[in-house]
Amino acid sequence: TPGLFSQRELIELPLEDIPDTEYSFPLPGGKVISPYGRGRGRHSGIDIKTYAKDTIRSAFNGVVRMSKSYSAYGNVVVVRHDFGLETIYSHNFKNLVHCGDTVKAGQPIALTGRTGRASTEHLHFETRVNGQHFDPNIIFNMKEQTLNRQRIGCSKKGNGIVVQQLPTIYPKPLQKKYPMELFKYPNVSLHLQNVSLKERIEL
């Protein structure tokens, strides 16, 4: 969601306040086969594997901002959530939702595949704020496949972002829930080259 920091210095992700019914591990039962930050290209997400055509689920309530075939991502779904968070699901065999659809946490949105640049059937999962990817392990405990109950703060630093844990008891938030309608863009782009506030994506 580029442009968030033109309105706020700190984007707060209050994970501790999200009810159990409003989050879902994106690929239940899956195993992480490639971690975030792997390799010289800095892996922009994590790769999770179960079996071909397994059900991929939306991590949180949100609105689908992209659902199409896109370069090395293959079939990809981008979901925009409250608080400026976006999640990305790619290499899908088939997308089950369309751009503009409202989705609930745990709702099936795609089936695992190996479209795009992928050597095996799996889910490439990313978390982003302001168009910048960060480690999904901050959001989810990958071993337990549960939500990390903490309060996260995202701030701008140069062309990137800094993501850090905030105290449980924190002064009055600099922002509350972002209405998703506040950030309407005609297009959503997962740039594969360095432009403005985007980092190069290496799958």
Give the role of each language-model region.
Residues 22, 35, 49-53, 61, ...:
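A structural micro-motif recognizing beta-strand termini
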Residues 55-66, 97-112:
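Short, well-structured beta-strand-loop connectors
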Residues 58-96, 126:
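Zn2+-dependent peptidoglycan hydrolase active-site motif and core
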Residues 81, 101-158, 162-163, 170:
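Conserved, short, structured surface segments that act as functional micro-motifs
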Residues 12-15, 29-58:
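Short glycine/threonine/proline-enriched tight-turn/helix- or strand-capping micro-motif at secondary-structure
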Residues 37-39, 53-55, 69-70, 102, ...:
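Short polar/acidic secondary-structure junctions
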Residues 1-35, 145-203:
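Polar/charged, compositionally biased leader and regulatory segments
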Residues 34, 50, 66, 91-94, ...:
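A residue-level detector for short acidic-glycine micro-motifs
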